């Protein structure tokens, strides 16, 4: 089905990064773009090189009418489950916007409860400029956090795999155990720390 923009002037796009990793927060961003300052080259953050993402991140954060972040920490993910924690992080991102949007477009197939109309857009990060912008802001933010975590725990290789369950990460979990930043409810982490 073809996506049709809603009739609203202040539209926020929302996306998340970090549902799959075993470590760190799930990070969401909300972005309201400025129609008078278009940004060329917005696309799904996963399809862009790191260098291109960084350049677009700077452009988005400078040119957008407003943008914000929302997050759910590992303890919240463990308590709620990853889906509910992601919805909570999205609600936080929208609530943190300094300008309240008239309408919210969310990447994926589910909408969190919001105080304004919202629509989930499947593959929205490739279809909707606002969602693409949000995906880039969230991805760059989370990748930077993983680079910082890598400084604290260099043996895990977080800067490289961003916390995803690669063979290297799983091997290090078994060898070294989990850090306090790992999601204890995720099966590979549970196994590593012996929580059956």
UniProtKB/Swiss-Prot annotation:
A family per Pfam: RNase_HII
UniProt keyword Manganese, yes or no: yes
Annotated protein name in UniProt: Ribonuclease HII
UniProt function note: Endonuclease that specifically degrades the RNA of RNA-DNA hybrids.
Record domain RNase H type-2: where: 9-196
Catalytic activity of the protein: Endonucleolytic cleavage to 5'-phosphomonoester
Family annotation (NCBIfam families): PRK00015.1-1, PRK00015.1-3, PRK00015.1-4
Gene: rnhB
Co-factor note (free text): Manganese or magnesium. Binds 1 divalent metal ion per monomer in the absence of substrate. May bind a second metal ion after substrate binding.
Keyword Metal-binding listed: yes
Organism of this sequence: Photorhabdus laumondii subsp. laumondii (strain DSM 15139 / CIP 105565 / TT01) (Photorhabdus luminescens subsp. laumondii)
InterPro entries documented for this protein: RNase_HII, RNase_HII/HIII, RNase_HII/HIII_dom, RNaseH-like_sf, RNaseH_sf
């Amino acid at each position: 089905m073809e996506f049709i923009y809603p009739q609203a002037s202040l539209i926020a796009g929302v996306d998340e990064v970090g549902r799959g990793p075993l470590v760190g927060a799930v990070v969401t961003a909300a972005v309201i773009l400025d129609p008078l300052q278009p940004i060329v080259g917005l696309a799904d953050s996963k399809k862009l090189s790191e260098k291109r993402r960084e350049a677009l991140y700077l452009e988005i954060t400078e040119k957008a009418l407003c943008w914000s972040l929302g997050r759910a920490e590992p303890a919240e993910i463990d308590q709620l489950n990853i889906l509910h924690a992601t919805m909570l992080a999205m609600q936080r991102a929208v609530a943190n916007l300094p300008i309240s949007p008239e309408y919210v477009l969310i990447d994926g197939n589910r909408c969190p409860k919001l105080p304004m109309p919202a629509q989930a857009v499947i593959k929205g990060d490739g279809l909707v400029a606002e969602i693409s912008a949000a995906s880039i802001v969230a991805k760059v933010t989370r990748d930077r956090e993983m680079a910082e975590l890598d400084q604290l725990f260099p043996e895990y290789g977080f800067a490289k795999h961003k916390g995803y369950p690669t063979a290297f990460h799983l091997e290090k979990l078994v060898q070294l155990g989990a850090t306090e930043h790992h999601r204890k409810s995720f099966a590979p982490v549970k196994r590593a720390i012996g929580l059956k």
